[in-house]
């Protein structure tokens, strides 16, 4: 057995299918029977039931309004993390969800975790919950857990108590070893207890949610029986409805069958006018979004999920994808995604999981065209939109503000990237390292540096080199130390001693510079001229045999006040090597000149090899 095989249950071997073809398989279909153990698995109609709904109506429905959203990142998402969120990360996530516009947020499982209990108490006691936001807490149908849950929520204005028990055939038989009546009694006993305990907390606006967990593995007739019994106990009204959540706890079948089961419940459950029908799709088969959309068309009112699809196993349904799918159809999602990079960075920081490059709407590559024909079509599409605003114009002649009210019609781009805070990216060379968003977020929020997008790839590779060599995680301080060492503190082969710039802002007259430097250990003074300070400095460095070509330049204020600092970023090709340089100084001019020196030293310092921009 090879070393690689030691980590799997059998030797790694792919067997090319050579078995018989299916009966009636067309001659043009050359697929052959495989050795996969298909006999071990049952179709859904055998394992659970065959749901028959020949008069289904959902295929003719359209999504025209957004559902009631409920974000479960802080509970379902958090419990699935290798490293569950710290209190600080939970606060960041909660604040993000509120800022985006979520009005129902599941904040934890306070009876199961002291950390969750403490977080619920914190956001209540610190008055962090807006009046129009309802927190949701999960609890199993057990008395001591229910009482603990109410203790956690004391003092909150609006709370949904979400109680559940599993009703599926498999869990009834294997996990609980209970019959149908016993499982139903678990649910109704919990409902009665919750209703009784709530009377001890009259200052809170209590709402109720019940989930027959593993609904997709439950016979719909029995699911209705349990739901009806719980609803009868809770006695909701049209003015004060309760939530019945029908989770695809494990996605077991195609989205159309899930939609049939939702429409069946929508039609048949008792007291439908007093029920908010909710969906909670998972993504085990990779069709969570489709299941949610079809289930919503089938009669649901509400959808639970996580940002970017975090959650157990393959995750919960992605609320970002769902909401922005609606936006592409002209439906207001009633959530804000105008800065999806910030949303992504915050979620990556909180979850310590990166959002994949191909994730809809938010991945690094989703608005990128690598194919030449795709690039051409995108460019022509943008030009055509510009011509609608100004006949004869192309995309470079019209600002985004002028295009913003124009209907979006660009090939290969289902949404205007700028509507979610992205750019019109033609080709981006993306480093394979993960964590660009997280690195950029920490550098921005903790250190005031808005690293240019293309530089983020380079710096994330620098950070990864350190973690590969030293192991462990890189915290905020360590990240700053890495950044300073890589970009700010190099003094070889060029160290700036003094710079004098003249005519930096004068029109029609070249800028000039006198630079006192230490070059390869020797004091030197060089002069230069150019159409700006950077060009003048490049001209001066040329006299030392250093060829500098500035290819990209970015700058911003890092701090404000009397001791304000500016940060500048320069992408330069230095003696044929393309690198980024960074400068921080009290003025933007001197920060920019420092950035050039930084790039020079990163390109030429033989003792400290730099990561090259673009990996070249």
From Swiss-Prot:
Its cofactor is Mg(2+). It holds the Pfam family IPMS_D2. Mg(2+) binds at residues 76, 280, 282, 316. It is found in: Cytoplasm. The keyword Cytoplasm applies. Pathway: Amino-acid biosynthesis; L-leucine biosynthesis; L-leucine from 3-methyl-2-oxobutanoate: step 1/4. It comes from the Bacteria. It catalyses: 3-methyl-2-oxobutanoate + acetyl-CoA + H2O = (2S)-2-isopropylmalate + CoA + H(+). Catalyzes the condensation of the acetyl group of acetyl-CoA with 3-methyl-2-oxobutanoate (2-ketoisovalerate) to form 3-carboxy-3-hydroxy-4-methylpentanoate (2-isopropylmalate). Homodimer. Belongs to the alpha-IPM synthase/homocitrate synthase family. LeuA type 2 subfamily. This is 2-isopropylmalate synthase.
């Amino acid at each position: 057995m090879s070393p690689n095989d030691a980590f799997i249950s059998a030797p790694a071997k792919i067997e090319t299918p050579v078995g018989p073809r299916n009966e009636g398989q067309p001659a043009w279909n050359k697929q052959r029977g495989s050795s996969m153990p298909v006999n071990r698995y049952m179709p859904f109609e055998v394992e659970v039931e065959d749901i028959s709904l020949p008069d289904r109506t959902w295929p003719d429905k359209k999504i025209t309004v957004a559902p009631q959203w409920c974000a479960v990142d802080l509970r379902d998402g958090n419990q699935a993390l290798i490293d569950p969120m710290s209190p600080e990360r939970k606060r960041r996530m909660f604040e993000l969800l509120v800022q985006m516009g979520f009005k129902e947020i599941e904040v934890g499982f306070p009876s199961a975790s002291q950390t969750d209990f403490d977080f619920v108490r914190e956001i209540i006691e610190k008055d962090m919950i807006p009046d129009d936001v309802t927190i949701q807490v999960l609890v199993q149908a057990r008395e001591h857990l229910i009482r603990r849950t109410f203790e956690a929520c004391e003092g909150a204005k609006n709370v949904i108590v979400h109680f559940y028990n599993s009703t599926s055939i498999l869990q009834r038989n294997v996990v609980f070893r209970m019959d149908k009546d016993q499982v139903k009694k678990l649910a109704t006993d919990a409902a009665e207890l919750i209703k009784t305990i709530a009377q001890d907390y009259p200052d809170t606006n209590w709402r109720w949610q019940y989930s027959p967990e593993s609904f997709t593995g439950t016979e719909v007739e029995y699911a209705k029986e349990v739901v009806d019994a719980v609803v009868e106990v809770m006695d909701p009204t049209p003015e004060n409805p309760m939530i019945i959540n029908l989770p695809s706890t494990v996605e077991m079948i195609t989205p159309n069958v899930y939609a049939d089961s939702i429409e069946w419940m929508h039609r048949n459950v008792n007291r439908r006018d007093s029920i908010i029908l909710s969906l909670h799709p998972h993504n085990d088969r990779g069709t969570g979004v489709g299941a949610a959309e079809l289930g919503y068309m089938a009669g649901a009112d509400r959808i639970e999920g996580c940002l970017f699809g975090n959650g157990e196993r393959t995750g919960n349904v992605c609320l970002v994808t769902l909401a922005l799918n609606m936006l592409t159809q002209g439906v207001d999602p009633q959530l804000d995604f105008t800065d999806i990079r910030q949303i992504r960075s915050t979620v990556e920081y909180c979850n310590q999981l990166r959002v994949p490059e191909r994730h809809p709407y938010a991945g690094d590559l989703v608005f990128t065209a690598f194919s030449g024909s795709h690039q051409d079509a995108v460019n022509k599409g943008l030009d055509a939109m510009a011509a609608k605003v100004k006949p004869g114009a192309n995309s470079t002649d019209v600002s985004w503000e002028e295009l913003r009210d124009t209907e979006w019609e660009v090939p290969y781009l289902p949404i205007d990237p700028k509507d979610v805070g992205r750019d019109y990216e033609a080709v981006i060379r993306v480093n394979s390292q993960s964590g660009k968003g997280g690195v950029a977020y920490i550098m921005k929020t903790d250190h005031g540096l808005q690293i240019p997008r293309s530089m983020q790839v380079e710096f994330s590779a620098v950070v990864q080199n350190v973690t590969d060599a030293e192991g462990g995680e890189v915290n905020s301080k360590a990240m700053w130390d890495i950044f300073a060492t890589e970009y700010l503190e190099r003094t070889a082969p060029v160290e700036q001693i003094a710079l004098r710039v003249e005519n930096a802002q004068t029109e029609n007259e070249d800028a000039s510079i006198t630079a006192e430097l230490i070059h390869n250990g020797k004091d030197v003074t060089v002069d230069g001229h150019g159409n700006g300070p950077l060009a003048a400095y490049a001209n001066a460095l040329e006299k030392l045999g250093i060829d500098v070509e500035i290819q990209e330049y970015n700058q911003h204020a890092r701090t404000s006040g009397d001791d304000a600092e500016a940060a500048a970023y320069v992408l330069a090709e230095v003696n044929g090597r393309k690198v980024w340089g960074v400068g921080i100084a009290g003025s933007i001019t001197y920060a920019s000149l420092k950035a050039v020196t930084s790039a020079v030293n990163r390109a030429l310092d033989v003792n400290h090899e730099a990561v090259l921009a673009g990996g070249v």
